[in-house]
A protein has these predicted regions:
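Acidic, surface-exposed loops and disordered segments
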Residues: 1-204
Length: 204
């Protein structure tokens, strides 16, 4: 790669490393509708199986409605003593990713692709986020008056991060559970690249 390409890759690599699941935010930092629409614009340009584009979105930056969405989510299963962020550290906005059964009954991995893309976009904006699949779907559908043909797939919580997150190499015990130290630094164990590659067929 030429130097400019190397620099671009290094920048992208840095954004990916920063794009951790952030669960504590500065709730005083407001996120407006325009910002959320920009993220939906990124999702619009993502790949979609058979180009069906079956995903729809609900955006929320209203404080009262955000509080209701918050109560529909399961926060950090491995941190059993932690019930989620206190009010001043809650997300400032949410994006709900929905599968539209009027378009297709198969959503494949489209929602994962768009969720990751929007979270990367949020990091470029200086924001952080967390992707939720632990959702009380019945409660969320009632809270947001979601039509029957729309199926909640993921919820993105967004805000200005106040959490320090550190990537660690998985220890000899093989424990993959994230944890927090006495300084509230959030540690995320990751497998080494060598463990991930199970076959190599390269001659250069």
């Amino acid at each position: 790669m030429v130097s400019s390409e190397q620099n671009l890759f290094a920048d992208f690599q840095n954004i990916v490393k920063k794009n951790r699941s952030c669960r504590r935010f500065d709730n005083s930092h407001k996120i407006d509708k325009k910002t959320l629409r920009k993220l939906i614009g990124l999702a619009r340009n993502c790949a979609s199986a058979a180009n069906m584009q079956p995903l729809k979105y609900i955006i929320c930056c209203d404080e009262d409605k955000a509080s209701e969405i918050f109560s529909c989510l399961g926060w950090a299963a491995y941190l059993r003593e932690w019930k989620g962020p206190v009010k001043k550290e809650r997300p400032g906005a949410y994006i709900i990713i929905l599968g539209d059964h009027n378009v297709s009954d198969r959503f494949w991995c489209d929602h994962g692709i768009t969720a990751q893309t929007m979270l990367l976009g949020a990091r470029f904006m200086g924001l952080g986020g967390c992707m939720f699949a632990a959702i009380n779907i019945k409660k969320l559908k009632k809270t947001l008056d979601i039509a029957e043909h729309l199926e909640p797939k993921l919820v993105l919580a967004l805000g200005k991060p106040v959490e320090e997150i550190q990537i660690d190499e998985i220890g000899k015990d093989g424990d993959i559970k994230y944890w927090r130290d006495e300084n509230q630094v959030h540690h995320v164990p990751k497998r080494r690249v060598e463990e991930l590659i199970v076959g190599t067929f390269c001659n250069i």
